[in-house]
Amino acid sequence: MYTSFEERLSLVKKCSEGSLAFYQKIPGAVHLEGNGWELISSDSRFAMFNGILIHSARKDLVDEVIAVLAKHDIPSDIRLIGPGISQLNALEGHGYKNLGSNPFMVWSADNSVDNFQLQDHLTVRRLDQNDIRTAADIYMDVYRMSEDVVKDMKRMFCVSQNDHTYGLFKDNEMVSIVTAMVYRDSVGIWSMGTPTKHQKNGYGRELLMHVMQSHKNMGAKEFFLYASSAGKFLYDKCGWLTLDYLPYLSKS
């Protein structure tokens, strides 16, 4: 399954293409592709919201990428895949630090979710702009984001019809949140989080399984996500497969 580099790259790029919907209402957003690299920028001063994917060992590629970032005045974090990993030393020479490798995971829709039933005391609702403050509070708690970072993130919250952001509720309190970005017959999972005080209650699993089941029933065939070390156990438990480990570099 997805054993070749070309297959893995195709899925990573499909996930990236789906994420473009986050930026559709940001006037200064940038999407550029070069020979062996791709830049997607939300016009944020925070590099975590601007990303470059490098997938080639081409000579002079890093200098080209650095020049593009300087031209557009964009701070950007970088992911490497396949032959692109050979560019690590060159990027470190430009001040980037390797923060480790993040799992890129996939779930191919199957019948493993068909019998899932949400616990009786829980409900799920698709969120909208009216939920932005509650969502922001959860992101600040889970990801330790500052108000300034969350301010930039708000520009990408529920701005597209393809953005299916869901909240899991217990007694009218949101106890978990996740974004499912629909793209063709695929779904990218982003920004999943459960407030600290509600963790270790299985809420993340309940919400993720509900989303997997719901979007499978809507016709989705492939689901993608980048896992954190903390979240990977949950995704493993829900039947996701690790497709690759992508080095993640940042100056911040």
Task: For each feature predicted by the language model, list its residue ranges.
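N-terminal charged segments
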Residues: 1-72
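A short, well-structured alpha-helix characteristic of acyl/acetyltransferase catalytic modules
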Residues: 129-141
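Conserved acetyl-CoA-binding loop-helix of GNAT-fold acetyltransferases
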Residues: 59-66, 194, 200-213
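Acyl-donor-binding surface of acyltransferase catalytic domains
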Residues: 56-122, 225, 249-251
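A conserved beta-strand-loop-helix scaffold within acyl/acetyltransferase catalytic domains
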Residues: 146-195
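A conserved beta-turn-beta hairpin within the catalytic core of GNAT-like acetyltransferases
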Residues: 45-50, 99, 181-190, 199
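Conserved active-site alpha-helix within GNAT-family acetyltransferase domains
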Residues: 85-98, 205, 229-245
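Conserved N-terminal entry element of GNAT/NAT acetyltransferase domains
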Residues: 2-5, 31-35, 109-129
